Regions:
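GHKL/Bergerat-fold ATPase module in large chromosome/replication-associated machines
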Residues: 58, 76-100, 120-123, 130-196
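GHKL (Bergerat-fold) ATPase N-terminal catalytic module, capturing the glycine-rich phosphate-binding loop
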Residues: 1-127, 134, 141
Length: 196
C-alpha cells in the first residue's frame, strides 16, 4: 500500500517526508529538482504581481512549489531510489537554495523518496509534532494515501506508536451525505488559497 510518512527530529530541527512511490533515478533527480539553477525560477520571480491569490497560482505553473521549502529550510536533502534500479543506485540531491546543488549516488534499500528539511532556527516550530499534525489536517486531510507520524506522547519511557493523521479519503470519492459542510469549506480554502 502506498503511503507518506513524516518524521521529526526535534534535536536537529529537521522534518523528513518520505513515500514508498516509484522513486527517482539520478538523472530524474537532476532533471526534476535541478531547476533551481534554471531560468524558470527567475521567470517565476519576474512574474510575481504582489496579489497573493494570483501569485500562489503561479507556483504550479512554474514548477517552483518544491522550492518554497527554502522559505523554512536552510538546506533540503532528497534521497530517492527508482523502482527500476538496484539498492546501490540510489541518489542524494542536496541544496541550500542557492544557484547550485550536489548530487551523489548512494545505497538505498527502500524504493521511494525522502525529503528532509533542515529548518532555519526561526522556523523550528515546524519540528513540533502537534504543529505538523494541524498542518496535515488543514492542508492534506483529503490526500488519498495515508500520512503517518509517530504519536505525540508525554510518557518519556513509552515508545510512541505510528498513527495515520489524515482521513486519507478524498472528498470526491465519498458520498455527499458523508461529507460535512466544514470539510467542503476547508477543502475549498486549501484548493483556492482563500483563507479569509
Amino acid at each position: 500500500e502506498f503511503g507518506i510518512r513524516i518524521d521529526i527530529d526535534e534535536e536537529s530541527k529537521s522534518v523528513t517526508v518520505s513515500d514508498n512511490g516509484i522513486g527517482m533515478s539520478k538523472e530524474e533527480a537532476i532533471s526534476n529538482l535541478g531547476t533551481i539553477a534554471r531560468s524558470g525560477t527567475s521567470q517565476f520571480l519576474d512574474s510575481l504581481t504582489g496579489d497573493q491569490k494570483k501569485d500562489s497560482q503561479l507556483i504550479g505553473q512554474f514548477g517552483v512549489g518544491f522550492y518554497s521549502s527554502f522559505i523554512i529550510a536552510d538546506e533540503v536533502v532528497v534521497e530517492s531510489r527508482s523502482a527500476k534500479l538496484s539498492a546501490g543506485e540510489g541518489v542524494r540531491w542536496s541544496s541550500k537554495g542557492e544557484a547550485e546543488f550536489d548530487v551523489e549516488t548512494i545505497k538505498r534499500e527502500e524504493v521511494g523518496t525522502s525529503v528532509t528539511l533542515k529548518l532555519k532556527p526561526s522556523e523550528a516550530e515546524f519540528a513540533d509534532g502537534w504543529r505538523l499534525r494541524s498542518i496535515v489536517k488543514k492542508y492534506a486531510d483529503h490526500v488519498a494515501v495515508p500520512i503517518t507520524m509517530k504519536q505525540v506522547t508525554t510518557e518519556e519511557d513509552k515508545e510512541p506508536e505510528d498513527e495515520v493523521v489524515n482521513t486519507a479519503k478524498a472528498l470526491w470519492t465519498r458520498s455527499r451525505s458523508e461529507v460535512k459542510a466544514d470539510e467542503y469549506k476547508e477543502f475549498y480554502k486549501a484548493l483556492s488559497h482563500d483563507f479569509q
